[in-house]
């Protein structure tokens, strides 16, 4: 096919894609069933991970819950069991590659293949760069992105054999735009968004269209990891709201899940703004939270 025909085909694909998106906006999408499917959720002892586990329990999924906190993950499991779910609990440090591989092997032996994985475990240390300890930077990347690599490397082979599965990357709006005093966190979330996009492209190239991918990108979430967050333009979300949006995105095979959904439009528009305008938006937005600046805790 010559270049002109390929370009015409590209135009056709663009028009079709926009029309399809328009139709999906007005017509509710069909939701797939995840009843009976085995779902692995990391960071399930708190916040978004815990509430996501509840949502999957309501969908009658079989749950494998990971968290570094035994108390937290056991609390989540107890509620999920009350909702009628079969639950398997593992205490796992998602910054430890050897522990991840060992735990995946244990899951395969005791539970079987994982059909849906939600890489949710996260770490955040609000501080200016010079006040951030080296080990905090390392931990942020180990949990927020390297752990994703080790988990997916361990789980992907069985998904490839079946040409079936769903890989969910929990990132953040901070994976698309930056916030001061969160340099390691923003950097790790940019990496997580890149991981999702690159993995999606690779699976498509391999022809493994049965393996779905989703990436969750919420704004500030009131999980307690960032103290006293506030902002003028973006809402501070509750974990249950984010979990409901996440499960809806998974059930409709949505690639990128922004919460709230209009953030996607905001990010697209901002791409066309000069730096001076973006700085003005940041001032108006007035994002604040407790952070260590100059080795002292301040509200920034």
UniProtKB/Swiss-Prot annotation:
Signal peptide: 1-19
Record EC number: 1.1.1.-, 1.1.1.62, 1.1.1.105
Residues that hold NAD(+) according to the record: 40-67, 189
Keywords on record: Acetylation, Endoplasmic reticulum, Lipid droplet, Lipid metabolism, NADP, Oxidoreductase, Phosphoprotein, Signal
Annotated binding of substrate, by residue: 172
Catalytic activity entry: 17beta-estradiol + NAD(+) = estrone + NADH + H(+); all-trans-retinol + NAD(+) = all-trans-retinal + NADH + H(+); all-trans-retinal + NAD(+) + H2O = all-trans-retinoate + NADH + 2 H(+)
Gene Ontology biological process terms in this record: lipid metabolic process; positive regulation of lipid biosynthetic process
Residues annotated as the enzyme's active site: 185 (proton acceptor)
Principal place of residence: other
Localization, UniProt: Lipid droplet; Endoplasmic reticulum
Gene3D superfamilies in UniProt: NAD(P)-binding Rossmann-like Domain
GO cellular component terms attached to this protein's record: endoplasmic reticulum; lipid droplet
Enzyme class: oxidoreductase
Modified-residue entries (N6-acetyllysine), positions: 79
Single GO MF descriptor: all-trans-retinol dehydrogenase (NAD+) activity
Phosphoserine: modified positions: 33, 69
InterPro entries for this protein: NAD(P)-bd_dom_sf, SDR_fam
Similarity section: Belongs to the short-chain dehydrogenases/reductases (SDR) family.
Function according to Swiss-Prot or TrEMBL: Plays a pivotal role in hepatic lipid metabolism. In vitro, it catalyzes the oxidation of a variety of lipid substrates, including 17beta-estradiol, retinol, retinal, and leukotriene B4.
Name the record gives this protein: 17-beta-hydroxysteroid dehydrogenase 13
Underlying gene: Hsd17b13
């Amino acid at each position: 096919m010559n270049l002109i025909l390929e370009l015409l085909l590209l135009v056709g694909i663009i028009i079709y894609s926009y029309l399809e998106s328009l139709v999906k906006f007005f017509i509710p999408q069909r939701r797939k069933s995840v009843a009976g499917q085995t779902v692995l959720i990391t960071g399930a002892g708190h916040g978004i991970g815990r509430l996501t586990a509840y949502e999957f329990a309501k969908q009658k999924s079989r749950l494998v819950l990971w968290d570094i906190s035994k108390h937290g993950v056991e609390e989540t499991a107890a509620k999920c069991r009350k909702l009628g779910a079969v639950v398997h609990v593992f205490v796992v440090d998602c910054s430890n590659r050897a522990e991840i591989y060992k735990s995946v092997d244990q899951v395969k032996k005791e539970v079987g293949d994982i059909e849906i994985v939600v890489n949710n475990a996260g770490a955040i240390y609000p501080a200016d760069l010079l006040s951030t300890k080296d080990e905090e930077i390392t931990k942020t990347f180990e949990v927020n992105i390297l752990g994703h690599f080790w988990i997916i490397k361990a789980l992907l082979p069985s998904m490839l054999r079946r040409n079936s599965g769903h890989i969910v990357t929990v990132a953040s709006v901070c994976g698309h735009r930056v916030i001061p005093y969160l340099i390691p966190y923003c950097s790790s979330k940019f990496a997580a968004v890149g991981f999702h996009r690159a993995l999606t492209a690779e699976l498509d190239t391999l022809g493994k269209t049965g393996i779905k991918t989703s990436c969750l990108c919420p704004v500030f979430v009131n999980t307690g990891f960032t103290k006293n967050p506030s902002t003028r333009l973006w809402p501070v979300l509750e974990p249950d709201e984010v979990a409901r949006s996440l499960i809806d995105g998974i059930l409709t095979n949505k690639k990128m899940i922004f919460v709230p959904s209009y953030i996607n439009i905001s990010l697209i528009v901002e791409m066309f703004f000069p730096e001076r305008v973006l700085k003005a938006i940041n001032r108006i937005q007035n994002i604040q939270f407790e952070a260590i600046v100059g080795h002292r805790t301040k509200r920034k």
